[in-house]
Amino acid sequence: MEANDQTQNIPAISFRSVRKSYKQDGQTYDVLQDVTGDIQQGAIVAVLGPSGSGKSTLLSMCNLMRTPDSGEVNIYGKEVREWNVNELRRTAALAFQSAPVLDGTVRDNLSLVQRLHQSQLYSPEKLASLAGLPPELLDRSARDLSGGQRQRLSLARTLSNPSSILLLDEITSALDPVSALEIEELIKRQHQEKKWTVMWVTHNMEQAKRIADTIWFMADGRLLEIAETDTFFSAPQHEAAKEFLKGGTR
């Protein structure tokens, strides 16, 4: 789905009183607590916060990798559980740090995803090039790739998707700084070209400064602060955000 006359003024992503908990060893752990916020169409939002703050869980709800216990997650104004799953995942594509690879070659992985998405936007060669995968890797077993190469493959698969929302979960965590910058530039170029909405979970504060126009700060399962990037880094409002910035909390 893309913006049209009916949807162009609707947030691309909205969360309304979202809660999620898990039970383990007889204990209940609140992962998300009453999260409410909107991401407008065309925005790049970086989601920051300490480990265990619920960032990845929140992101994964946008394409039904997980579901909330209560509350709503809406994509273009439609609750995610009302979507056809395949259509939803063609609209909101997820790339994450530990994405599994499929049996077969890198080319096979890319071609299969293209068939699933009914998309031939790019050839496997073009997708590999966009994601910074050397062409000689296309016919290598995907299971032989390094951690960083697997992250690039995950990104290439996401780029094959005719989506308008890009959900990124620590996609440069296994890359060296130069490679991470290359991926950032790729995302920014594609964002400008395709007018994507991007929700990017990262621990890297410098990366967030470079890529995002808006920061969402989370801690202990709560969305504590939403601010323009410059404002967040120069004048955070919440005490937990101040401590995070001061100590580089992870």
Curated annotation (Swiss-Prot):
Residues 13-245 form the ABC transporter domain. SUPFAM superfamilies: P-loop containing nucleoside triphosphate hydrolases (SSF52540). GO terms for molecular function: ATP binding; ATP hydrolysis activity; phosphate transmembrane transporter activity. It comes from the Bacteria. GO terms for biological process: phosphate ion transmembrane transport. Belongs to the ABC transporter superfamily. This is Putative ABC transporter ATP-binding protein YjkB.
